[in-house]
Design a protein with these regions (language model features):
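C-terminal cap of thioredoxin/glutaredoxin-like
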Residues: 39-125
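Structural alpha/beta surface segment adjacent to cysteine/selenocysteine redox centers
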Residues: 1-44
């Protein structure tokens, strides 16, 4: 459990730089992805830090065991992957998160549909 700030000081913000950093970290390896994503969410929703700022991104990368220089060197490749992912999502008619498209093309959207997704994957739906 995290004590969230429902109206953080820096929301809405530009989440793109943090998203690019997550992709760059995934490509680079060597750290803990779960800790990185949790750290970015915590920075925004608990610590009220601006996740669009390079210093915040560097801190989150370093705390999760990644090279903080990815905030500089990796963002371009992260942005390219992000754009490609966005194009694929639009082509698949994705319109929210979480959103899952299974091999049959059936879509599951929303936290409240994860149980249905589990049933589908188990062959029970």
């Amino acid at each position: 459990g995290m004590a969230l700030t429902l109206q953080p000081a820096h929301w809405p913000t530009n989440a793109a730089p943090s998203s690019y950093a997550i992709i760059a970290a995934q490509d680079a390896g060597g750290g803990d992805m779960g800790k990185l994503v949790h750290g970015i969410l915590r920075a925004c929703w608990v610590e009220e830090r601006d996740i669009a700022e390079d210093a915040v991104i560097r801190d989150c990368l370093q705390a999760a065991g990644f090279d903080p220089a990815l905030a500089d060197s990796g963002l371009l490749s992260g942005a390219e992957t992000y754009a490609a992912n966005l194009e694929r999502a639009v082509a698949a008619n994705v319109f929210g998160a979480p959103f899952y498209v299974v091999d049959t093309g059936q879509s599951f959207w929303g936290q409240d549909r994860l149980g249905d997704l589990d049933l589908h994957l188990a062959g029970k739906l």
